[in-house]
Amino acid sequence: MVDSSPPERPDLYVVARMLERLWRENGPMLKTRLQTACNVNYDVFRKYLAWMLSKGLVSVQNCEDGHERVSLTPKGEESYRKLVQWISEVIQGRMPGQ
């Protein structure tokens, strides 16, 4: 599974890209496919995946075909919604409902 040490201070844009890609997929996603979709190298991906696992945002399933798939947990889905709302309000200056 994941044996990489998580980042001490994660880049929220990387976290947001990973959460968003998993949210849009609407189901488990192959690790390598998620890594390329997030446009980060594999070492960076492993660190962020370890961090997200430690926070309960994602889960990793070993599948019968020998591949590992990543999916959002309910906590990950809620975190994605909150992050999108925060970006809209703070970064883009939009209030909810606008």
Model-derived regions: residue spans:
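A short, conserved structural fragment
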Residues: 53-63
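Short alpha-helical segments that sit at the start of domains
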Residues: 1-19
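Short acidic, hydrophobic short linear motifs in intrinsically disordered regions
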Residues: 27-37
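Basic, amphipathic "hinge/linker" alpha-helix immediately C-terminal to the N-terminal HTH DNA-binding motif
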Residues: 66-80
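Amphipathic alpha-helical dimerization/coiled-coil segments
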Residues: 1-3, 82-98
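Short amphipathic alpha-helical interaction segments
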Residues: 9, 39-54
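Short helix-capping/hinge SLiMs at alpha-helix to coil transitions
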Residues: 22-26
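Soluble, non-transmembrane catalytic domains of enzymes that act on hydrophobic metabolites at membranes
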Residues: 8, 34, 55-57
